[in-house]
Amino acid sequence: MELTPREKDKLLLFTAALLAERRLARGLRLNYPEAVALISAAVLEGARDGRTVAELMSLGREVLVREQVMDGVPEMLHDVQVEATFPDGTKLVTVHDPIV
C-alpha cells in the first residue's frame, strides 16, 4: 500500500488519538501531544461528517476539559490548527483555547 505524506500524517494522528482515547478510558490524564491528537482527530472526523468550520471550531472546545489533562497542558495549548478536507476543498480550522 502506497500512502502520500499527508495520508501518513493523518494515519499517525488517528493512531495517537486512539491511544489517547484508551488512556482516557482507563482514567489517565492526557499529556500535551495526546490532547492535541484527540482534538485534531475530532475536527478531522467532523469535517468528514460534513460539519462546517464554525461547528468544528466549537466542537474542538468540547472534546476535553481541564480535569482530563495533566497540569499545565491547558496553559500550553492556546490554539490547535488542523487542515481538514471538506466537500468544497481543504480548509484550515483553528480551535482557540480548546481546553477550558
Curated annotation (Swiss-Prot):
Reactions mediated catalytically: urea + 2 H2O + H(+) = hydrogencarbonate + 2 NH4(+)
Annotated compartments: Cytoplasm
Chief location bin: cytoplasm
Gene Ontology CC entries for this record: cytoplasm
GO molecular function: nickel cation binding; urease activity
Listed Pfam families: Urease_gamma
Keywords: Cytoplasm, Hydrolase
InterPro entries for this protein: Urease_gamma, Urease_gamma/gamma-beta_su, Urease_gamma_sf, Urease_subunit
PANTHER family according to UniProt: UREASE (PTHR33569:SF1)
Subunit structure: Heterotrimer of UreA (gamma), UreB (beta) and UreC (alpha) subunits. Three heterotrimers associate to form the active enzyme.
Name used for this protein in its record: Urease subunit gamma
Lineage start: Bacteria, Pseudomonadati, Pseudomonadota, Gammaproteobacteria, Pseudomonadales
Gene: ureA
